Amino acid sequence: YDNRNNRYTYWRLFGDAYVNLNPVKGLNIRSTFGLDYAQKYQRNFTLPYNTGFLNSDKDAVEMKQEHFTKWMWNAVATYELEIGKHRGDVMAGMELNREDDINFAAYREGFAILTPDYMYPSAGVGQSQASGGAGGFSLVSFFGKLNYSYADKYLLSFTLRRDGSSRFGSNNKYATFPSVSLGWRISQEAFMEKTKDVIDDLKIRAAWGQTGNQDIENYARYSIYESKYGTGNPPTYGTSYDITGSNGGSLLPSGFVRTQIGNDDIKWETTTQTNVGMDFSLFNQPGWLLDGVEY
C-alpha cells in the first residue's frame, strides 16, 4: 500500500521492413531495415513511517529514465545459375548494426508537501544526487558465399566474411573469417547402383571454418579516468583535496585517477572448427531411417 504511487513505465517499438527485387532471371536483391526502440521511466517515493518498533522520518523521490535504440540495415544479392550438370549460386552482401543506450537519474530529499503532484526533484530542499551515462557500439560486416555442385555428386561451398567493430582499436578493428566445405554423394556413383535397394543416400563431407566473437565491453580499449571526491557514508579516500588547507573546506578541486588501462591491441576472438562426417539413408524409406556420424 505504501508503494501505491510508485510508477514504472516501459514502452517498446520494434519491427522491420524490406524491399525485394528480381531485375533479371536468377538474380535476387533484398534490402532490410530493422528498428528496436525502448523507453523506460521509473519514479519511486520514500515516505516517513512509524510501524511498531520501526520508524523513519525520511522523505525522498527518485526518478530514472532510459532510452535504448538498436537498428540494423543489410543488403544482400544472390544469383543462381544452372547449366547442364553444373549448378551453383553466389551471394554477396553487407550489414550495418548500431546500438545506443542513454540513462539518467535524479534523487532529492526534503519536501514540504508529501504528495506525488509536488514531489519532484526540483521542489526538494535536502540532499540531492544525479547520475547518468551513455554507451553504444557499431558493427559493419561484408560477406559472400559460393555454392557449387556437379551432377548432385560433388559439392563445394565457400564462405568469406569481414567484420569491423568499434569495440576494438585501430590495430584490430577488422578481422576476416573464411570457411569451406566439401561433399561427395557416393550413392550417385555408378558403382553404387547395385546397392540402391539398401543404401538410398550416402554422402561424406568435410568442413573447416573460422568464426569471430566481439563480446567485450564497449569501451574496453580505452583508458578511463574518473574524479572521486571521497564523499559518502562512511567517507572514502578520493582524488580531491581541500584547497584552503582546512578540514571541511568548501573548495575542492578534483583530481583524476585512472580506473582502466587502454589497450589498442585487443582483438577479435577467433574460433577455428574442423568437421568430417557421413550422412546416410537406408532401405529407400525417407524419414524412416536417416542418420549420420561426424567428428
Give names to the regions the model predicted.
Residues G52-F53:
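N-terminal, polar/charged subdomain of small-to-medium soluble alpha/beta proteins
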